[in-house]
């Protein structure tokens, strides 16, 4: 079951944490035309920017939902960033080997109830 951040990233917790941006974030951005994926081996810190997504409206930073090391990236997004608009919850950005998982990640119900 996915957990969510206040900055609209989702994280599927497991042996590696799979992450992406929420449907709300994708809808707010509009048509996504480019994503700068993080690099495998890149250290990331929960709540800190790890990559960027560019839409027809804006360029936005994507924050890491957990602290750890990127172990895999979804290279399909390099050629088809619009996959995020089509199904944000399936179009994962990367997988992170987590060393710290913040306690303030929200359930889907908590995220849906949050003022956006």
Go through each PLM region and give its residues:
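Acidic, low-complexity mobile loops and tails
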Residues: 1-52, 82, 86-116
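Short, Lys/Arg- and Gly-enriched loop/turn segments at beta-strand edges
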Residues: 54-63, 80-83
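ATP/adenylate-binding site constellation spanning eukaryotic-like Ser/Thr protein kinases
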Residues: 64-67, 89
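Generic hydrophobic/packing signal
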Residues: 66, 74, 97-100
